[in-house]
Amino acid sequence: MKQILTTARRRTVLLAVLVLVAVLVLGGRLAQMQVLQHDRYASASQTTNTREIVHPATRGRILAADGTPFVRNIAHSTVTIDPQVMREQDDDGRSIVDAVAREVGADPETLWGRTRTCGSKDAPRPPRCNSGGAYQPITLAEEVDPAELLPLLERPEDYPGVSVDATAERGWPKPNDALASQTLGYLTRVSAQDMEGRDDLQPTGMIGRDGLEAFYDKELRGTTGVTKVAVSPAGKFLEEIEHTDAVAGLDIKTHLNPAVQKVAEDALAQVSQIAATNNEATDPEDKGRAKTGAALVMDVETGALVAAASLPGYNPEIWSGGVNSEQLETLVDEDEGVPLTNKLISSVYPPASTFKAISLPVAFSQGLDPDEEYSCPARVKVGDRYFRNFESKAHGDLTLQEIMEVSCDTAFYRWSFRTWRALGGINAKDVTDPYVELAKGFGLGSRTGVDLPHESAGRIPDREWKLAYWESLKEGYCERAETGYTEEEEPDAQRRAELEEGAQEFCLRGYQYRGGDAVNFSIGQGDVSTTPLQMAVVYAAIANGGNVIEPRVANEALDVSGEVQKKFSTTVRQRVGFDEESLRILREGLEGVVTRGTASWAFEDWDHERYPLAGKTGTAEVAGDQSTSWFVSYDAGKDSKYVTLVVLGDSGTGSEYAAPVARSLWNTMESEGLLEPKAADEPLSSQDAAADLKAAAERAEKAGAETVTVEDVTEESLVGPVDTEFQQADEPSDDPSDPSASDEARDPSGDASASGD
């Protein structure tokens, strides 16, 4: 018995020792955690048990030049529910959601779907599911009728976790009924791709997709507010730890004048309908044309865009609440003219005779005599192809100014061909083409830098471009040259033979920069393409003395109190080094276009003494289509202020369709007080060329802008009788009665004729 007690006592002592050791170990570990590693575990505890609730900032407005809003925020009521309260309910909050649905007249399943986390098993597809955080209030219903909200407000105890908040969505007041839809842009929901690398975006937020909404998204969106809360391990709210208020976005004040913008939109739409009607009357099969175009007004010194219209336009209210698939299809439908595309900056057209304002200074640098007259025959011959004047008209002997007034094509063919020949013709290598260089000097072939997204660079087709173009297509054309075309592909035997011959020619010699390329280039045809805004910048440079400016829609950014926080000033990108006499002659020619030349009928009752104008028409002809009409103009007083541009695709001549739209713009600008009347003793801009060149040079030097000039490479006189033939023996033959002037080695499927008014 004594032995048994001794054994039991030993076991008790051993157990006590083990317990003591365990207590000491646990106590030591606890001390380590509480004292030695206190900061580490306190931080871990805080991180694990805190949550952030994001408060969206009010988005800034987009304002007209006078401060009236083009885009504003419209407050409306939104019903939200706290996800934490839902989790505390036995049915996960389903009964609360159903009760809210009954009160606001909504489908319970739709509202319940909005509470389900996107990607979970029972969640509908985005955006009908919840993409917010676990503690972010969930939006159940938006734009609710105030009468339906009364039960929620009067008996909040019946709807635990439910709140009625005032939120904002975009509204478009349309000042003066102006839309400016493509310029303003639109918003859509933030996508997962948008979130990559961005900590300023929220999955439930909106982001600018186009126009000013996209370009100035950072300024407009503001800074979100954040409330940091402590929660228990079970997720229950404990207390608010920290709160940061949201900071409203900045308002973007533009240079847009609503009255001028409205006229630009309406006049474009009206002349588009007239052109379509006239074309259909001429050809009953010609339907659905003249649907695209653009019109603008820009300050020639600052690049400020006073009006920026794109045809066809659309009502921006289509974005309210999001577009459906049918609406989106209409916005991108080519048969409807792709309303979503901003034709001002994203669409390109052959500039046609408006390009002669670049080619004349080039030809002048190659030896033109300002005191001579130059013949303007109906046609000239390059290789075995005739290149004709617009409507095959002959105008006799003309001064350089008169050549611009009547828009003589054949004079430019002659000048550009001689320069091409002086450079080595088709055998030229590593040459500097003055026509190409000055076009690039005016900014063509590069984006203007305007504060709008999705801008096209256009195309200046030099020798390098043609080689690259040929290399990209030669395999297909060489294969066609070998296999030919089947009767099923082209039933007409003559057309089939033409296609096969064209494929053979392109396969073997499509890389050559030929005389046809050169003469097409000189009048803005062939493969030359520009955006409307690019050509406006060209004419602004002519009006201001040579400075190529960067256009701007936005003027400044304002905070909620109206204080200026940012100024969006423009810059001189580069300078065209005009010869004084060259600029004078060019300006005189452009002034004559409006008073005596191709655009004179549209301005026959205009007060030229008080408000002198200068401009150039253009008619770009593309095989198989109606012509694209152009008119670019500027006020031609001592200090030119504005340039206007109008282009209408697939319509007719520039004098018939584009010039009348410009006339409407100038009428409105005069009535709005934007034009300064010329004093009787003040010179025209052509007579003030020297002063403008000096002022432009000083500004360009201050901006550090490069000056672009061209050298005389022709080394032969451009004076004298017109050559009866510009014969190039190794160029292929073609039908001499063919009025087109496209390059004979171009892609046969995209032929363009060289003709302009």
Q: What is the predicted role of each segment?
A:
Residues 110-124, 169, 280-302, 377, ...:
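Acidic/histidine-enriched alpha-helical segments
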Residues 260, 266-313, 320-321:
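Phosphate-binding glycine-rich loops and their immediate beta-loop-alpha structural context
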Residues 564-571, 659-734, 738:
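Short, gly/Ser/Thr-rich active-site loops of penicillin-recognizing serine hydrolases
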Residues 152, 248, 252-269, 699-734, ...:
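N-terminal leader/targeting segments and the immediately adjacent pre-domain N-terminus
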Residues 233-239, 243, 293, 301-353, ...:
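Beta-lactam-recognizing serine transpeptidase/beta-lactamase-like catalytic domain environment
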